[in-house]
Swiss-Prot record:
Protein name as catalogued: MFS-type transporter tazK
Gene Ontology annotations of biological process type: export across plasma membrane; xenobiotic transport
Induction behaviour: Expression is positively regulated by the azaterrilone A cluster-specific transcription factor tazR.
Main localization, broad class: membrane
Family in the record: Belongs to the major facilitator superfamily. CAR1 family.
Keywords: Membrane, Transmembrane, Transmembrane helix, Transport
Entry function: MFS-type transporter; part of the gene cluster that mediates the biosynthesis of azaterrilone A and other azaphilones, a class of fungal metabolites characterized by a highly oxygenated pyrano-quinone bicyclic core and exhibiting a broad range of bioactivities.
SUPFAM superfamilies: MFS general substrate transporter
Length: 356
């Protein structure tokens, strides 16, 4: 859908994917066999990836680089806080009479509410499509049928869309070293988060003896770190803009990379901290507090890398980010598959040191 947003506008592909994601929750909630649940979980994951893939291009349409940095900070924070909070709330819902099915119904209800609000509030921002609609309106009002937009001059056929635009994210990914290297780093960082989602229950529930719900509450420290990271990245962007303006220069994409160094160091420190304090013989508080530098590191890395790609590709950012989303989602989905065996074989401390 990322390439589709560069042909048909941002809004239509965005909400088409969104509606399909919401509808995919119904078979999950009502399914009585594993294949049904797994198939529609997969489809839900595919359709939900449309939103983050298109959001980058949407923000690039109407925000200046300085404003974009703050907006991306908020967006990136929500995409990371959501899974962390979801790991906690899902444990609460599992204790209800409906069990795991309640998580699907909750997702659907929240999706409907936020989707309706978003459809009403969010405008179309992709300039070629806005121009095309404006030209169509003027033709109707003036009866001057010669009025047309740039998009009208070279309409995209279905065949051209399937052969050129649909393959664009993959072709960009394999042909552009910057995009490929950034995608590898983003994907590995994203995978670490989902490995930690498995590590926390193992460490706090199985090893420290916490309850199912209490064992997920330490994830709130990661949420706190994510919020701190968002503030730091926003402050860094605004400070850099002021310094550049004072010297008569403009913000360049490479300026986004400097805070990533801080984020990488923070993530490494947090993982070491978490591993070294994971022994049940040690108070849980040091291990809980390790989530703060982990959250800061993950937030700053993912946020600044996303802002960097948006700055480079601007109107083509949706296609670039779509390729990144494919790899990132595959890594985030496959890492937890081997996590239980890894933690069982090596223990939390050694396993976290290995991935660090």
């Amino acid at each position: 859908m990322g390439p589709a947003s560069e042909v048909y506008g941002r809004k239509l592909p965005f909400f088409l994917g969104y509606v399909l994601f919401v509808l995919s929750q119904i078979p999950v909630a009502l399914g009585h066999d594993a294949p049904t649940v797994l198939v529609f979980r997969f489809l839900g994951g595919v359709t939900s990836s449309v939103c983050p893939a298109i959001t980058g291009g949407w923000l690039a349409d109407f925000l200046l680089p300085a404003e974009r940095g703050v907006a991306v900070a908020i967006f990136a924070a929500t995409t990371l806080v959501g899974p962390s909070i979801g790991a906690i709330t899902s444990q609460v819902q599992l204790q209800t009479a409906m069990g795991w099915r309640m998580t699907a119904w909750t997702t659907m209800i929240l999706g409907i509410v936020s989707g309706v609000a978003g459809f009403i509030i969010l405008p179309e921002t992709y300039l070629p499509v806005v121009e095309q609609r404006h030209a169509r309106k003027l033709r109707q009002e003036t009866k001057d049928w010669a009025l047309h937009s740039r998009l009208d001059e070279k309409p995209v056929s279905i065949r051209e869309f399937l052969t050129k635009y649909l393959t664009l994210p993959i072709s960009m990914l394999v042909s552009e070293p910057i995009l490929l290297s950034m995608t590898i780093y983003i994907s590995f960082t994203f995978g670490l988060i989902y490995l930690l989602f498995v590590a926390y229950p193992v460490s706090f529930v199985q090893e420290r003896g916490y309850g199912a719900i209490d064992g997920t509450l330490p994830l709130l420290s990661i949420c706190a770190g994510i919020i701190v990271g968002a503030f730091y990245a926003s402050w860094s962007t605004l400070t850099t803009v002021k310094q550049k303006a004072a010297s008569g220069n403009a913000l360049v994409p490479e300026d986004r990379l400097h805070p990533m160094i801080v984020g990488a160091v923070s993530l490494a420190i947090g993982l070491l901290w978490f591993a070294w304090t994971s022994s049940p013989a040690i108070s849980p508080w040091p291990q809980i507090l390790a989530g703060i530098p982990i959250g800061v590191g993950v937030q700053v890395i993912l946020l600044q890398s996303l802002a960097y790609l948006i700055d480079i590709y601007t109107t083509g950012a949706a296609s670039a980010i779509s390729g990144t989303m494919i790899v990132r989602s595959l890594v985030g989905g496959t890492f937890p598959l081997f996590a239980p065996q890894m933690y069982r074989k090596f223990g939390v401390s050694i396993a976290v040191l290995i991935i660090q």
